[in-house]
Amino acid sequence: MDRRDFLKTLAVTGAVMTVQRSEAMDILAQKLTNAGGGKVDLVAVMGGEPEAMFRRAITEMGGMKQFIKPGQKVVVKPNIGWDKVPELAGNTNPKLVAEIVKQCLAAGAKEVTVFDHTCDDWQKCYKNSGIEEAAKAAGAKVMPAHLESYYKPVSLPKGVRMKSAKVHEAILNSDVWINVPILKNHGGA
């Protein structure tokens, strides 16, 4: 599938999901059980404070120790792209980031680093989003991603068109990478 076909498919899917949003929300709100008793790899939790919802979801998935082993270096990459206060919900919720950091450390992580490549001024984004303060208070190291010097070239031998990429050193030096986007439900998402 080429990029144009992918974008068309994505647009049609988005339109269908917008029309069927209420049906999709009904599906997500259902109480489902793990009838087979196997390992769960997807959990949807709705309603409540972000940190409580995360605790519930990670417990359903077997706990953070399923993903973090003692001594590992962890990168938590939230969305800190915008110079917005938490009340505007433009970035990942700082309470959620703090809870994930705490859970990683409780599972035995050697260190947890939090960073994002921001769209607005990184220092304002980190501060005004509340994520810098929350992450540090939870025990994480916070680092920027705005300088080219943070990125190292990586070969992509199986790439069809892209044969190399520059990857942030925090990711290259980590054992575990946790992406924590902000969930969006607007048409631009």
What are these regions (language model features)?
Residues 1-189:
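N-terminal and secondary-structure boundary signal
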